[in-house]
Amino acid sequence: MARYKGLSILSLFAVFSSLASAELDCSNIKVDGVMWNFGKLGGAHSISETASSHEGYNTTYTLDICKPLTKTLCKKGAFVCAVRNATDINGIERTMDVIDIAGNFVLNSGRTLDPIFTRLKKEDPKTEGLKMELHGGKHKFGNLLKRQKAVITLLCDRERTGLEGLESPKPDGDKKKDGEKKDDDKKDNKDKEGKSKRDGEENKRSLIFKSYNEEEGTLDLEWKTKYACENVEDGGSAPSGHWGFFTWVIVLYVVLVSLPLLSERVTNVRCHSQPVPVHFGLSDIRLVAQLQPVWSSRVGLASSQ
């Protein structure tokens, strides 16, 4: 019996380990009949945020929307990880906190990624893209253990691949600070120049940090990319703009109704010595005229979706 239990535990451990390393099929996401392929956005990408209320602190958010991160301070199975650093008076940066935001943490908390996808056009017809909500993380702030999640809004931008301005994380989860002010910069110009550089970099970057709410445990990111569009090559594919099923039923009905009339007229032509012109009756023309607006509206509706 002990041996059987041992095998069961090993088997369960193997199952949980495989769940922790499970990938997200980012190249085949289907919502409301629309397919998205974000495979080219895969890989670990980082973005940093400096908390204005805590001078000297900065947080680096690293994510991979396709598979678990491999080089990170977060637990195994993390898809989104936050590393909070602080710089001391000697200019040495130290890691102060690590936050597991999203991932498959079956071996730790039993929570999984549980992805939720929402087509943006469903919320706003004028906005094209996909909202990706990833779960699984937990973190203790004070005495409270907060559940974490990442909300990534992938917006359609046909001029961007989505890789513009992205940073590659270091093995420890930190990153190189592009555009960071040097220590010998003048104090009077530091804030002004720093803000100007941040604004310029933000305009160039496709992945943008929006907010992190500690009370709700929610990280909000925005990602501009052509792969969020619904009709780009290797990206999204819009619902078919061809005629729908109901439209084809109407067309088939008209054809079936017209066939007996046409057959009768052809028979009459063969029976008469003099040629008799073949034409549709006035009722047929009226029927087609009445159905024409219906076809037009159906085609227009399909094209707009």
UniProtKB/Swiss-Prot annotation:
Q: Write out the transmembrane intervals.
A: 243-263
Q: Which cysteines are joined by disulfide bonds?
A: 26-66, 74-81, 156-229
Instruction: Tell me the keywords, alphabetical order.
Output: Autophagy, Cytoplasmic vesicle, Disulfide bond, Glycoprotein, Golgi apparatus, Membrane, Mitochondrion, Signal, Transmembrane, Transmembrane helix
Which PROSITE patterns does the UniProt entry name for this protein?
MRH
Q: What is this protein called?
A: Autophagy-related protein 27
> How does the protein associate with the membrane?
Single-pass type I membrane protein; Single-pass membrane protein
Q: Which residues lie on this side of the membrane: Lumenal?
A: 23-242
Could you give one GO CC term from the UniProt record?
A: cytoplasmic vesicle membrane
Topological domain ranges for the Cytoplasmic compartment: 264-305
> Main location per UniProt?
membrane
Recorded hits in Pfam families, A to Z, give: ATG27
Q: Which residues form the signal peptide?
A: 1-22
Q: Which GO terms describe its biological process?
A: autophagy
The record's region (Disordered) falls at 163-202
**Where would I find the MRH domain in this sequence?**
24-231
Which residues are tagged as glycosylated in the record? 58, 85
Q: Which family does it belong to?
A: Belongs to the ATG27 family.
Q: What does this protein do?
A: Effector of phosphatidylinositol 3-phosphate kinase signaling. Regulates the cytoplasm to vacuole transport (Cvt) vesicle formation. Plays a role in ATG protein retrieval from the pre-autophagosomal structure (PAS).
Query: What is the top-level taxon of the source organism?
Result: Eukaryota
SUPFAM superfamilies, per the entry: Mannose 6-phosphate receptor domain (SSF50911)
The record's Gene3D superfamilies line, in alphabetical order, gives: Mannose-6-phosphate receptor binding domain
Compartments in which it is found? Cytoplasmic vesicle membrane; Golgi apparatus membrane; Mitochondrion membrane; Preautophagosomal structure membrane
